[in-house]
Amino acid sequence: MDEEKEFRTMSGVPVGSVYGSGPLPGEFPYTRGIHAGMYRDRLWTMRMFAGFGTAEDTNARFKELLRAGGTGLSTAFDMPTLMGRDSDNEWSIGEVGRAGVAVDTLDDMIDLFADIDLGQVSTSMTINGPAAILLAMYVAVAEQGGVERSKLNGTLQNDILKEYQAQKEYIFPPRPSVRLVSDVVGFTTNEMPRWNPISISGYHIREAGSTAAQELAFTLANGFAYVEAAQNAGLKVDDFAPRLSFFFNSHSDFFEEIGKF
């Protein structure tokens, strides 16, 4: 938004960049944001959740969204992929490519991102149980295209605990599942410094029927569990915590939501 230097309300009243006293945006403890100019200076990534049919179908959709002005990609996978099953598995009948894109193999992932410069676009992948496998495929595609893994920018949802609590798309028991999460955190911390290895998600918990307070409580508890698991695996919290992201719901009870955030 470099071209827009002055902001006004619909009534023409100028809007200042910062109001009130106390900690300022971009300064410790960052309760008002991590960037000094916030979204006036650093506009958020515009990405539409997309995925359907075959990898080729979704690749065409990705390109259409980027041509329309999207600045990032957000990948929706079908139910068999989310559950770690191949499209020809008998339990996949009726679900292949229905609620997202079907990705069974590395060749599918190559087709999914064909002719897209992964060094210039950030990619969000909404995947949990098989997140480590899909990340490995993504890295392989990028490196085949000449992009170093250290240059990749994006996010894995990779929040398996909320699956037991809300969405129910889990594959393994909790302890080995959290081990997989911490393994991904360790890999990205060492190899992919621009990658967010977990999107700790309250959204699904709220949609499953929780209150705002419960959404916040479960999400923070899950986040603490991931931090402890990574520390127990030998990682230093300051090395990985800055790359942890969060995904919350926003309901219509204005003041309650302000209090939550």
Predicted regions and their residues:
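Catalytic alpha/beta active-site cores
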Residues: 1-257
